[in-house]
Amino acid sequence: MSAQPDIHAYIAEFDDIPGTRVYTAARARQGYHLNQFAMSLMKAENRERWKADEAAYLADWPMTEAQKDAVLARDYNRLLDLGGNIYFLAKVFSTDGLSFLQAVSTMSGMSTEDYAAMMNAGGRSPDGVRSISANRAAGGATGSEANRAAAGAGNTREDC
């Protein structure tokens, strides 16, 4: 009889794919208050308070400073790393007047037009940085160098 596969080890393998974030139970716990903040923007009165003074509105939420800083910077990639769920974060960019397409294009390092064209043509090319560890082992760029290179392919992870 074979042993049960380790689901945590399996999910951890996805961390090696640039730009891929599996929304796990751990990530959900990490981002609980962040996502609750985002959902609060469903109410008009909360959106008005948010627009009037973002920092003051965030002060009412028990989020980490890193989460608050990322919200204020509208760094959606960082917010995903900090437990944000893109469907909850949609409330933030909708409040800013951005469409899903506009917001997601900011995560790719591409203009909205270039991102839309890429997606309409079938999505990101399979060429480029496909594995963080393989790229490092091959002596490829790491850190911000790989991040910039990956952005052109739709990747923006800090740990490329």
Regions found by a protein language model. Give the residues of each.
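Charged, low-complexity intrinsically disordered segments
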Residues: 2-160
